[in-house]
Design a protein with these regions (language model features):
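Short, conserved charged micro-motifs
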Residues: 252, 344, 442-451, 499-508
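Feature representing long, continuous alpha-helical segments
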Residues: 410, 414, 453-461, 507
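Aromatic- and Gly/Pro-rich donor/ligand-binding loops
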Residues: 72-76
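Conserved PLP-binding catalytic core of the aspartate aminotransferase-like
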Residues: 423-495
Length: 526
């Protein structure tokens, strides 16, 4: 035995957490589940969660929060105006997305957690701090030029953004139809774009997405969520830059099987968008997962922390919307922010002839936020949820936690693949495993059958496992143009809750899907 050794490696991973509370699962029968399916019109979203064995419908808001988060719930300030959590949350975002890594964090949340009674210190370090020029104005700048908006979830942030953009574009260009490209619009983003009368486009490499190397393993992640830069250039030139008001990037690329986006690709998207004077909008529900993939797979980032990578990544966007119910490691929360006096502000504000501001787009967004969701101090969130979110954002920067999470996804995907299930998208993303329904059914089900929905409902009926169909049915294949149909990934998603599922759950799902695959011919169409 080497007494001087400082490390004793094992062939298994070190546990990342332990359970404080457990919930017993129901034992519903096939007959009971079928009765419930009939009663809910065979709608996977309407099926009672209390009758499920494993619920993988979404990873949004389903997190098992940490003991630190539960503790901060008790520190929630429910004041209507400028609750303490407002200051803490905005500075948490500055810490992680702007300050370049842990060594530069202020972490003012610790002043609240330690019950700081020094009023002068709280005024100087929390309440009266002035910030401008970035994504999170503070103090007088946030009041004069609001650019940061707490909203209770991501789709609401998208809705506020797109409603204001729609209003501005309609006033300037009545009747004009715009095109908004992305590497992959999620269904809510696509819905919000359609509601503003614009055309959503998904520009990614579909052939690469479904490609699998022999043996099912890549040496390095190929970043299948990347935007196809050539297609982006062609689209902008084809429709004209004046007809593309925004370029979106989904990070990680949820509709395209949760695949990550490389930093090199993000830089290129930024370059192309700014070349044509178009603001770049990030949809960053899973920002931390994407930073993990960059760290593990992209040259030059191995020695950087998740927070350091996040600071660089966010430096390339003009606007971002976030559902913080994912990588906020929380059950509720969202954010909309744009760069102070940046390209989005310049393009969508109105100015007088002398250059002074006539209408500030941030003020329009703030009015919408307050009229629909509540005072800008809380944006529809409770004070306790704001504090839990601030704590959770730091939790998502922990490499050990994130590594464990991504490995859970890969374990599930490899379990399907090794059991011969066709259509598994590899490598797995950071939040879910996806199966290509076209390949699963051997190309025998056309797009009018909505077989992915049939698959998801049969999985509920037989085994009490709920997943999300994110293909032909939910993305409205039959209502799309031929171009849009070609861009659609006909998949179902097995979302993995944060810090909640065990290997036992995953093994049960692997066994169930394997058996269903063997009997796939009997799965009914919709």
């Amino acid at each position: 035995m080497d007494k001087n050794a400082t490390n004793y490696p094992l062939s298994v991973s070190m546990p990342q957490h332990c359970a404080y509370v457990v919930r017993d699962l129901p034992h519903a029968t096939v007959e009971q589940r079928e009765r419930a399916l009939n009663a809910t019109h065979w709608n996977e979203f309407a099926f009672p969660s209390g009758m499920l064995t494993v619920d993988m419908l979404s990873d949004s808001g389903t997190t098992a929060m940490t003991n630190q988060q539960w503790a901060t719930l008790f520190l929630g300030d429910e004041a209507y105006g400028r609750n303490t959590g407002y200051y803490v949350l905005l500075d948490t975002f500055r810490d992680i997305f702007e300050r370049g890594g842990e060594k530069n964090w202020k972490k003012v949340i610790d002043l609240v957690r330690t019950d700081c009674r020094d009023i002068e210190k709280m005024m100087d370090e929390v309440y009266l701090c002035e910030y401008e020029g970035g994504l999170f104005n503070g103090g007088a700048a946030q009041m004069e030029r609001p650019n940061t908006f707490i909203i209770q979830q991501g789709r609401a942030a998208e809705s506020v953004l797109m409603e204001i953009v729609k209003k501005i574009l309609a006033a300037r260009h009545p009747g004009k139809v715009f095109t908004i490209p992305s590497n992959g619009h999620f269904d809510t983003t696509e819905g919000n774009i359609k509601q503003m009368g614009s055309i959503p486009r998904n520009l990614y490499n579909k052939e690469l997405l479904y490609e699998i190397p022999e043996g099912g393993s890549y040496e390095k992640n190929p970043f299948k969520g990347n935007m196809d830069i050539e297609k982006l250039e062609q689209l902008i030139q084809g429709v004209g830059p004046e007809n593309v008001p925004l370029v979106f990037t989904c990070i990680t690329n949820n509709p395209i099987c949760g695949q990550p986006v490389s930093m090199a690709n993000i830089r290129e998207i930024n370059r192309v968008a700014h070349k044509y004077d178009i603001p770049l909008v990030f949809d960053v529900a899973r920002w931390a997962e994407n930073c993990y993939f960059i760290k593990m797979n992209e040259e030059g980032y191995a020695d950087k922390s998740i927070a350091e990578i996040a600071s660089e990544m966010f430096s390339y966007c003009d606007v971002f919307t976030m559902s913080a119910k994912k990588d906020g490691h929380a059950n509720m929360g969202g954010m909309l922010a744009f760069r102070d006096r940046g390209l989005f502000w310049q393009k969508f504000s109105d100015f007088n002839e002398d250059g002074t501001v006539k209408t500030d787009v941030g003020v329009l967004i703030k009015v919408k936020q307050i009229s629909c969701y509540g005072n800008d101090s809380y944006g529809g969130m409770s004070g306790r949820d704001i504090m839990a979110l601030a704590c959770g954002l730091y939790e998502s920067c922990d490499f050990g936690y994130m590594h464990d999470r991504v490995q859970q996804c890969e374990y599930l995907a490899q379990g399907f693949y090794k059991n011969g299930v066709k259509g598994v998208v590899l490598p797995a993303g950071g939040h879910a495993v996806y199966i290509n329904m076209d390949e699963f059914f051997d190309g025998k089900r056309d797009h009018t059958t909505f077989a992915g929905t049939g698959f998801s409902l049969e999985l509920i009926r037989r085994y009490g496992i709920r997943v999300s169909e994110l293909g032909d049915f939910s993305m409205e294949y039959d209502l799309k143009t031929p171009e849009q149909q070609a861009e659609l990934a006909n998949v179902v998603r097995f979302a993995i809750d944060r810090s909640r599922l065990t290997k036992e759950h995953l093994d049960y799902v692997i066994a169930a899907v394997t058996e269903l695959y063997k009997d796939r011919e009997s799965i009914p169409n919709m």
